[in-house]
Structure formats: structure tokens, C-alpha cells
Regions:
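A detector of single, family-specific signature residues
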Residues: 1-213
Length: 213
């Protein structure tokens, strides 16, 4: 699936190709709804946007199977392009023992998005802390390894007029401290969001009841 063009490859029960079409983002659902009987199986790679379109197709009565790209690749017969990929998906989904990806609900995608954003923010915060450590070391200041101690050291460095820091660097360091605090606040917001999700999710509730969790 491209962003604006959808390559469709249709086969019958004997895997004989019936039609190949390039459809636009605006009309592909309408064309499928008018052309393909409800209940027919539709396969897609589980790439970006696949879960959204899978839900839309399910709403129209189709059975949707998502396949991880690595399981489709062995069935691409020639040069990789949209048409060959669509044909490979058809072949892959008919293979016995093929493993499929469960279609995520909107709520499940929300949870995934929250965790992805939190993970990225955590990387940014670690990078910011390391940047601060590297800069202050050039001025003879030893930065604590743990971030909780770094937070405590920053205001002390800024207030200490005897540590040899120039006014220019103090302003720079104050800005970096502000950056770090913003990242801390965003992380705290997402931690609260994750806690709310855990309270409302039945699976998370059961996991929390396990010893050691």
C-alpha cells in the first residue's frame, strides 16, 4: 500500500488471478465494496496504516488478514513493486501455517502510540543529560551519572559564583536545564496516561495481580 495508490490483486479459490487494479486512496474502499462480495478474504502487509484500513474493511463485512512484511518477501517472484507485492500477499495468505497479525483496535493503537512517544522522549532525555555532562566536564565540573543527581547538581552549578563558569555558559546551561525539565514533565504526563490505561484495561489489571509485577 502506497500513501495515495492501492494496488489490488484478486484471485479465486484456485488462486487464479481474476483482476489487477491500481486504485486511489479516495475510491478504493468504494470499488472493493461494489466489486468484491462481503465475507471475502482480503490480505494486506501489516505496514503503516494497515490496521486503520483493516478496520474499515471489516466494517464493510470483509475478512481481513494482516501479514508481516518478512513473511511476504519470500513470495515476491520478480522485481519489487506494488503489483508484485500485491500478488505475493495473495500467495502468502493462502499458505498453510501462515502467521497473521491481529488487527488492532483504536484503543490498542492509542496504547502503542503512547508507549512509542514515551520511549522516544526517554531517548531524548538521556541524550540531553549526556550533552550536559559532556559540556560541564569541559569546565572542570563532574556530572553525576544518575539523572536524579544531575537534576540536583544543575541549580547548584548555576548559583555557585566561584566555580569559574562564564555568564555566557551559565545562560546556556540554564537553557539546557529548562530543556531537561520540559522532557521530565512530558515523561510524567505520559506515565500518568499509562497508569490510567492500566487501570481501565482488563488485561493490565490481571497482570498487575501477578506476583512480582
Amino acid at each position: 500500500m502506497a500513501k495515495n495508490v492501492f494496488q489490488v490483486h484478486g484471485v479465486d479459490r484456485k488462486e487464479k488471478a481474476l483482476w489487477r487494479r491500481r486504485l486511489t486512496r479516495e475510491n478504493w474502499l468504494k470499488v472493493l465494496h461494489e466489486t468484491v462480495e462481503p465475507g471475502c478474504e482480503i490480505g494486506m502487509e501489516s505496514c503503516g496504516g494497515a490496521h486503520h484500513w483493516a478496520r474499515r474493511l471489516q466494517e464493510k463485512g470483509f475478512t481481513v488478514k494482516l501479514i508481516a512484511p518478512q513473511f511476504v518477501k519470500p513470495y515476491v517472484k520478480s522485481n519489487k513493486n506494488d503489483a508484485n507485492d500485491a500478488e505475493a500477499i495473495c500467495e502468502a495468505m493462502s499458505r498453510p501455517g501462515m502467521r497473521f497479525v491481529a488487527v488492532k483496535t483504536v484503543a490498542q493503537q492509542d496504547i502503542q502510540a503512547v508507549h512509542r512517544v514515551r520511549s522516544e522522549l526517554n531517548k531524548q532525555r538521556t541524550a540531553k543529560a549526556n550533552q550536559i555532562r559532556g559540556l560541564v566536564s569541559e569546565y572542570g565540573l563532574v556530572a553525576p551519572k544518575e539523572i536524579v543527581h544531575l537534576r540536583r547538581a544543575l541549580p547548584r552549578w548555576l548559583e555557585d559564583v566561584e566555580n569559574g563558569l562564564s555568564e555566557r555558559f551559565r545562560r546556556l546551561l540554564d537553557g539546557l536545564w529548562s530543556d531537561l525539565k520540559v522532557l521530565d514533565e512530558r515523561m510524567e504526563e505520559l506515565d500518568r496516561e499509562i497508569a490510567l490505561i492500566a487501570q481501565s484495561d482488563p488485561v493490565a489489571k490481571r497482570l498487575q495481580q501477578l506476583r512480582g509485577v
